[in-house]
């Protein structure tokens, strides 16, 4: 395609990194990595538990204001935004590297939320004042909890960390024409900035997230396509351009799909059988969009909406895990450390991973500002490793930490705990480290 970006060279061997977060104790600090390297072949978990995270990382208030101004159509300084993005992405890549993370990204520093993502990347829609939830589609990803705990939500107890779904909806986005991808320039800039930031940094993986058709559908109401299936495939046709461009640029594609679990809350009247049909349809559309992309270039991230709330009515992982594993991915990142879902490691006592696939359980959470103890992180990783195999586990986070914890330093401290916990788990599982 005309907007393809030249692939980046990533090392075939990976570096076993010693955590250096102490050198990067200020968010956004320009840290030049200086590490001792121990070359190992990148096979399975490379003789230890590798580490990654789910996407969003802290950014400065100045950059946040510029990014939101662009997304909301407000005046902003384009040159200042470009300069801030280049600087902060450069710094956040090095900060991840210094922490000892093996699989890094751009921190999603240039993105805002799912609704604005649709507005910036697609055409064929229009925004109109919200109808207050009338019509077929519920608007709350906490819908079942809302029915049981209306007083809690009425009191404002439903923070989203400034991410998608926070606050009252001022407008609703309607699909009124064939959906087309229009994010070529924004994506080209995003890829180029990340590529430049990686120069001189040796990592196991460099990944970029993109949203699934099902997740995008959350924030669009269909007034154009003749059926639900046609609508989903319309989104898939548009978004496959972004998916392919990310992979063609040399990056791992992370598909963010909170839709698979959190759609259950959006449709409170569905039975599990009905919801499984709902989820199957969206996986079919996603796999259609991913067709032609090598499976080993794809990882899937699923979570239960990441809002701060009761989550009592989340669908159990066991009810949908087989559908999750139908997504054509080489690794599966699953929220797994919060108080509602941590017990679900037992699902893997009798559920097998797809052949050759990796599991990335969230062992660090965003639902609390408590810093997880590295020994707790290690315990969580060892549990999974004993069930699916130590070579098939990678340490991850429940969701993006950037907008969901109380301060940037908390997010980075959590990632320090992640890396140290993985080191402790590796020592137990391999008898070294």
Language-model regions: role of each:
Residues 32-433:
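Domain-level signal for soluble alpha/beta catalytic cores
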């Amino acid at each position: 395609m005309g907007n393809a970006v030249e692939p980046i060279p990533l090392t075939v061997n990976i570096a076993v990194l010693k955590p250096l977060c102490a050198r990067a104790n200020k968010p956004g600090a320009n840290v030049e990595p200086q590490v001792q390297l121990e070359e190992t072949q990148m096979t399975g978990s490379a003789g230890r538990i590798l580490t990654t995270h789910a996407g969003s990382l802290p950014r400065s208030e100045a950059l946040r204001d510029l990014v939101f101004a662009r997304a909301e159509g407000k005046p902003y300084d384009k040159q200042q935004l470009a300069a801030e993005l280049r600087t902060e992405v450069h710094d956040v890549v090095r900060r991840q590297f210094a922490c000892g993370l093996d699989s890094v990204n751009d921190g999603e520093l240039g993105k805002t939320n799912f609704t604005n993502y649709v507005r910036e990347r697609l055409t064929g829609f229009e925004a109109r004042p919200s109808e207050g939830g009338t019509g077929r589609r519920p608007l709350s990803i906490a819908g079942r909890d809302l029915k049981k705990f209306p007083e809690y939500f009425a009191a404002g107890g439903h923070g989203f960390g400034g991410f998608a779904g926070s606050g009252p909806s001022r407008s609703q986005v309607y699909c009124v024409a064939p959906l087309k991808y229009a994010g070529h320039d924004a994506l080209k800039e995003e890829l180029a900035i990340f590529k430049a930031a990686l120069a001189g940094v040796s990592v196991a993986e460099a990944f970029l997230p993109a949203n699934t058709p099902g997740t995008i559908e959350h924030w669009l109401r269909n007034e154009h396509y003749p059926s639900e299936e046609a609508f989903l495939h319309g989104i898939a046709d548009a978004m496959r351009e972004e998916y392919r461009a990310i992979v063609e640029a040399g990056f791992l594609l992370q598909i963010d799909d909170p839709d698979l679990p959190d759609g259950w809350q959006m449709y409170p009247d569905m039975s599990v059988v009905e919801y499984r049909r709902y989820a199957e349809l969206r996986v079919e559309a996603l796999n259609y969009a991913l067709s032609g992309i090598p499976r080993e270039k794809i990882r899937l991230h699923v979570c239960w909406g990441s809002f701060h709330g009761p989550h009592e009515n989340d669908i159990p992982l066991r009810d949908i895990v087989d559908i999750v594993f139908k997504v054509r991915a080489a690794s599966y990142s699953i929220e797994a450390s919060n108080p509602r879902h941590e017990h679900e490691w037992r699902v893997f006592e009798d559920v097998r991973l797809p052949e050759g696939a990796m599991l990335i359980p969230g062992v660090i959470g965003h639902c609390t500002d408590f810093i997880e103890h590295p020994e707790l992180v290690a315990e969580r990783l060892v549990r999974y490793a004993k069930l699916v195999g130590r070579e098939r586990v990678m340490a991850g986070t429940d969701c993006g930490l950037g907008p969901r914890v109380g301060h940037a330093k908390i997010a980075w401290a959590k990632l320090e705990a992640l890396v140290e916990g993985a080191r402790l788990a590796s020592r137990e599982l391999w008898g070294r480290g």
